[in-house]
């Protein structure tokens, strides 16, 4: 199991991550969300994190071109897609950025998992409800 702290917004959050050493530190880089940060802030946070922690940029329904543009300023290690992105978008993001692409999906049925596998992401993040809700997925479906 690997751990990602997500929604990181402040240098104090990064200091906490540096102390606890999760494998990943996630930052919301799409506008319109409570924990969204600017690319400028993300750049500062990435510079402050421990080298042993990978930086994950979380994007919601953005184009591969937009994500690649953000990457010019923010040195990310992983791209996480958290919207209704298609396999074509997943592939386009990977091609444009050269980074691993993770895809978050809501899991209500076994068919949801099968459909998610067709997206071609490097990793799937399986959720019970949309991100940050604290609702556990049905572990029986995932097993």
Predicted regions and their residues:
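Conserved N-terminal beta1-alpha1 strand-loop-helix module at the mouth
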Residues: 1-143
């Amino acid at each position: 199991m690997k751990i990602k702290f997500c929604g990181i917004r402040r240098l104090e959050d990064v200091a906490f991550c540096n102390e606890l050493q999760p494998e990943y530190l996630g930052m919301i880089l799409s506008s319109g969300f409570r924990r969204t940060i600017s690319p400028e802030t993300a750049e500062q946070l990435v510079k402050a994190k421990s080298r042993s922690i990978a930086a994950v940029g979380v994007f919601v329904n953005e184009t591969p071109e937009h994500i690649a543009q953000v990457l010019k300023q923010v040195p990310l290690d992983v791209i996480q897609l958290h919207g209704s992105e298609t396999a074509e978008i997943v592939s386009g993001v990977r091609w444009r950025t050269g980074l691993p692409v993770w895809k978050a999906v809501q899991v209500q049925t076994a068919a949801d998992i099968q459909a998610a596998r067709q997206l071609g992401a490097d990793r799937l993040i399986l959720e019970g409800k949309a991100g940050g809700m604290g609702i556990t997925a049905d572990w029986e479906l995932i097993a």
